[in-house]
Amino acid sequence: MSRAGSWDMDGLRADGGGAGGAPASSSSSSVAAAAASGQCRGFLSAPVFAGTHSGRAAAAAAAAAAAAAAASGFAYPGTSERTGSSSSSSSSAVVAARPEAPPAKECPAPTPAAAAAAPPSAPALGYGYHFGNGYYSCRMSHGVGLQQNALKSSPHASLGGFPVEKYMDVSGLASSSVPANEVPARAKEVSFYQGYTSPYQHVPGYIDMVSTFGSGEPRHEAYISMEGYQSWTLANGWNSQVYCTKDQPQGSHFWKSSFPGDVALNQPDMCVYRRGRKKRVPYTKLQLKELENEYAINKFINKDKRRRISAATNLSERQVTIWFQNRRVKDKKIVSKLKDTVS
């Protein structure tokens, strides 16, 4: 039998005892006296039933109990109904206080003046969720009006099952609100991966990839952290050449460091990126001798001759063609200088 049902049965027994003319017990009279003196029982205590000998005394006791309940802020429904029934007959028992439902204390609504004087609320916290096989990242930012004691007052606020205080930077924020011009907006990025029980924080300079989504699951847009990466690595690809020095130490790094505290590497010890032409490689004496002999025979070459020279000198056909072009330009410069000296 439920608690409400047991209370109803006790009320019926009290009504039957009052009709038979049984006198009220000492405990009932003491409870009625306590209610009359302004004391109120807690809402978790057992219900109190009082049998009275006269309707006027029952009405006075019920009124005193109702006044005490109103003064303490708790309302017990059903009291007015019992008091109305007690005034009809002097032999009927009256229930002084019968809690039918857990008492609820309503909070007063804020006045318009208080709402207007309230500071602007802080930006809402972005919560990340972990549905199925998906990967969801979230960004929590806090700025104006965020208080440290507000975080302490809500310890149950969580981010995917983890407390918000663990991943929010509250250093420098006092118990009072900080003006907007003194506190910059700070944020921490937290990511959740499939198969991991706890989130982790991002490290600048690393790319976060998205796990495979199953069929029927919505695909959400993920972000890629690109701090520390040069723009040319992705925009231009690897079409251009990258050159490194010959005697390169073991600890040299190619990527630029994204942490401001790191010491910059020396220029000769690191690889150099060049978008221009290749580094000039001088030809050997045998290659130059073969090219000079062919140039002395004919300053212009055809396709067959170019292929034969390329096979003999171990050079590409393009290198052979460019060498002949440069050799002709050199002859023109020599001739022009001779003319200038003669004139």
Curated annotation (Swiss-Prot):
Residues of the DNA-binding region: 276-335
Alphabetical list of SMART domains matching this protein: HOX (SM00389)
One BP term from GO: embryonic digit morphogenesis
Consequence when changing S316C: In BDE1 and BDD
Residues annotated as transmembrane: none
CDD domains reported for this sequence: homeodomain
UniProt cross-references to InterPro entries, sorted A to Z: AP_axis_regulatory_Homeobox, HD, Homeobox_CS, Homeodomain-like_sf, HoxA13_N
A molecular function GO annotation: sequence-specific double-stranded DNA binding
Disease linkage: Synpolydactyly 1: Limb malformation that shows a characteristic manifestation in both hands and feet. This condition is inherited as an autosomal dominant trait with reduced penetrance.
Function according to Swiss-Prot or TrEMBL: Sequence-specific transcription factor that binds gene promoters and activates their transcription. Part of a developmental regulatory system that provides cells with specific positional identities on the anterior-posterior axis.
Name of the molecule in the record: Homeobox protein Hox-D13
Source organism: Homo sapiens
Gene symbol of the encoding locus: HOXD13
